[in-house]
Protein backbone atom coordinates (compact mmCIF):
# COMPACT_ATOMS: atom_id res chain seq x y z
CA UNK A 1 0.00 0.00 0.00
CA UNK A 2 1.29 3.45 -0.91
CA UNK A 3 1.47 5.88 2.02
CA UNK A 4 2.90 9.41 2.30
CA UNK A 5 5.90 7.90 4.11
CA UNK A 6 6.79 5.34 1.41
CA UNK A 7 5.58 7.01 -1.81
CA UNK A 8 9.19 7.47 -2.96
CA UNK A 9 9.69 3.71 -3.05
CA UNK A 10 6.71 3.03 -5.32
CA UNK A 11 5.92 3.28 -9.00
CA UNK A 12 4.45 6.68 -9.98
CA UNK A 13 2.80 5.53 -13.22
CA UNK A 14 -0.97 5.63 -12.79
CA UNK A 15 -0.99 8.19 -9.98
CA UNK A 16 -2.79 11.52 -10.32
CA UNK A 17 -0.42 14.47 -10.15
CA UNK A 18 -0.54 18.25 -10.29
CA UNK A 19 2.32 20.73 -10.66
CA UNK A 20 1.91 23.23 -7.82
CA UNK A 21 5.15 25.20 -8.18
CA UNK A 22 7.75 25.60 -10.91
CA UNK A 23 10.62 27.77 -12.09
CA UNK A 24 8.68 28.03 -15.34
CA UNK A 25 5.10 29.34 -15.15
CA UNK A 26 3.94 27.24 -18.10
CA UNK A 27 4.16 24.07 -15.96
CA UNK A 28 2.14 25.36 -12.99
CA UNK A 29 -1.37 23.93 -12.92
CA UNK A 30 -0.70 20.95 -15.20
CA UNK A 31 -2.61 17.97 -13.82
CA UNK A 32 -3.43 14.49 -14.95
CA UNK A 33 -2.34 10.87 -14.74
CA UNK A 34 1.31 9.87 -14.94
CA UNK A 35 1.81 7.65 -17.98
CA UNK A 36 5.62 7.47 -18.15
CA UNK A 37 8.66 8.33 -16.06
CA UNK A 38 12.34 8.66 -16.90
CA UNK A 39 15.34 9.78 -14.87
CA UNK A 40 14.64 13.48 -15.46
CA UNK A 41 11.03 13.72 -16.64
CA UNK A 42 7.46 12.69 -15.95
CA UNK A 43 4.93 12.38 -18.80
CA UNK A 44 1.37 13.34 -17.81
CA UNK A 45 -1.86 12.63 -19.71
CA UNK A 46 -4.00 15.72 -19.11
CA UNK A 47 -7.06 14.34 -20.88
CA UNK A 48 -6.53 16.64 -23.85
CA UNK A 49 -2.87 15.90 -24.57
CA UNK A 50 0.36 14.67 -23.04
CA UNK A 51 2.81 16.96 -21.26
CA UNK A 52 6.47 16.21 -20.56
CA UNK A 53 7.53 17.81 -17.28
CA UNK A 54 11.15 18.08 -16.04
CA UNK A 55 11.37 16.77 -12.48
CA UNK A 56 14.12 19.11 -11.28
CA UNK A 57 12.17 22.31 -11.99
CA UNK A 58 8.85 21.60 -10.26
CA UNK A 59 7.03 20.66 -7.06
CA UNK A 60 4.46 17.91 -7.57
CA UNK A 61 1.27 17.21 -5.63
CA UNK A 62 0.58 13.47 -5.87
CA UNK A 63 -2.84 12.03 -5.05
CA UNK A 64 -2.43 8.55 -3.61
CA UNK A 65 -4.96 5.76 -4.27
CA UNK A 66 -6.50 6.28 -0.79
CA UNK A 67 -7.10 9.96 -1.59
CA UNK A 68 -4.23 11.36 0.48
CA UNK A 69 -2.21 14.16 -1.10
CA UNK A 70 1.59 14.37 -0.90
CA UNK A 71 3.74 17.30 -2.04
CA UNK A 72 7.18 16.31 -3.37
CA UNK A 73 9.98 18.47 -4.74
CA UNK A 74 11.00 17.01 -8.08
CA UNK A 75 14.70 17.33 -7.20
CA UNK A 76 14.22 14.61 -4.59
CA UNK A 77 12.86 12.12 -7.13
CA UNK A 78 15.30 12.88 -9.96
CA UNK A 79 16.58 9.35 -10.57
CA UNK A 80 15.77 6.41 -12.78
CA UNK A 81 12.56 4.85 -11.43
CA UNK A 82 14.22 1.48 -10.87
CA UNK A 83 17.05 3.13 -8.89
CA UNK A 84 14.73 5.41 -6.89
CA UNK A 85 12.66 2.44 -5.73
CA UNK A 86 15.80 0.78 -4.28
CA UNK A 87 17.18 3.97 -2.70
CA UNK A 88 16.81 4.63 1.01
CA UNK A 89 15.34 8.00 1.94
CA UNK A 90 15.58 9.85 5.21
CA UNK A 91 12.34 10.41 7.06
CA UNK A 92 10.26 13.17 5.52
CA UNK A 93 8.00 15.36 7.62
Curated annotation (Swiss-Prot):
Gene3D superfamilies with a match to the protein in the record: Ribonuclease P/MRP, subunit p29 (2.30.30.210)
Gene Ontology annotations for the cellular component aspect, listed alphabetically: cytoplasm; ribonuclease MRP complex; ribonuclease P complex
Superkingdom: Archaea
Reaction(s) this enzyme catalyzes, per UniProt: Endonucleolytic cleavage of RNA, removing 5'-extranucleotides from tRNA precursor
EC number from the UniProt entry: 3.1.26.5
GO term, biological process aspect, one: tRNA 5'-leader removal
Pfam families (alphabetical): RNase_P-MRP_p29 (PF01868)
Alphabetically ordered keywords of this record: Cytoplasm, Endonuclease, Hydrolase, Nuclease, tRNA processing
GO molecular function: ribonuclease P activity; ribonuclease P RNA binding
Record note on quaternary structure: Consists of a catalytic RNA component and at least 4-5 protein subunits.
NCBIfam families for this protein: RNaseP1Mthb (NF046110)
The protein's role, per its UniProt record: Part of ribonuclease P, a protein complex that generates mature tRNA molecules by cleaving their 5'-ends.
Protein name as catalogued: Ribonuclease P protein component 1
Primary gene name: rnp1
Amino acid sequence: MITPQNVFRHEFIGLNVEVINSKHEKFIGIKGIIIDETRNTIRVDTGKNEKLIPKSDVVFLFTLPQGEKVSIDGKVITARPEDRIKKKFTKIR
